[in-house]
Amino acid sequence: MGNKIHPTGLRLGITQEHRSRWYATSKMYPILLQEDDRIRRFIHKKYGAAGISDVLIARKADQLEVELKTARPGVLVGRQGSGIEELRTGIQKTIGDHSRQVRINVVEVERVDADAFLLAEYIAQQLEKRVAFRRTIRMAVQRAQRAGVLGLKIQVGGRLNGAEIARNEWTREGRVPLHTLRAEIDYATKVASTTYGVLGIKVWIFKGEVLGDEAQSMPVGASPRRRGNRRPQQFEDRSNEG
């Protein structure tokens, strides 16, 4: 079962949290759900260069709170916070309510190469540049290992290297216990558009096990190049506060 079901959905409430946190009536639920989908599509389409790995949405009364986890917070924030205001206006336009209070928090991803979505995005970019898929996978594995992950699995499917018959190729390094519910598995998918068609990319990253109320921390390992062990940046939007 662990190989069939979505790793995040299987672990909701155990090691994973919901990407949207709000309550609604049966009448409003589909409306708000579609709003969340439009917001996420808008953010990933317009700010794809910012390396956004996750978008968390929370609703409190008439306030909409959006938390963005990104590898390049400077691209989102802009000069003197001008990017935040532009993003807020774009979200209000997307949901069709310019009077809605939108609060935006930008959090920097501490380990870029240990994030499944960002690693899948890197693989997609390399494949779209016509880099051989085996070389791309090998480079992605090396980057993740330098970031200190406990294990990872990468699968690429489609017309690999322009072959006539589509197939799947995968590799695994370390442990990826998909059947263990307490295992913290970071899972992401991405599509690469090539001249031969689309390639599907799946990435599983094992970050440790949650034992009771305490999580087994990821080994420190080697730090990413040129980034050091500096503290991750966090930009909290306080413009709506009195």
From Swiss-Prot:
InterPro entries: KH_dom, KH_dom-like_a/b, KH_dom_type_2, KH_sf_prok-type, Ribosomal_S3_C_sf, Ribosomal_uS3_bac-typ, Ribosomal_uS3_C, Ribosomal_uS3_CS
Nuclease among keywords: no
MF terms in GO: mRNA binding; rRNA binding; structural constituent of ribosome
Protein's UniProt keywords contain Ribonucleoprotein: yes
PROSITE patterns associated with the record: KH_TYPE_2, RIBOSOMAL_S3
KH type-2 domain: residues covered: 39-110
Biased composition annotated in UniProt, kind: Basic and acidic residues: 233-242
Biological process, per Gene Ontology: translation
Stored PANTHER family: 30S/40S RIBOSOMAL PROTEIN S3, SMALL RIBOSOMAL SUBUNIT PROTEIN US3C
Self-association state and partner proteins as the record states: Part of the 30S ribosomal subunit. Forms a tight complex with proteins S10 and S14.
Function of the molecule: Binds the lower part of the 30S subunit head. Binds mRNA in the 70S ribosome, positioning it for translation.
UniProt name for this protein: Small ribosomal subunit protein uS3
Species name: Prochlorococcus marinus (strain MIT 9303)
Gene: rpsC
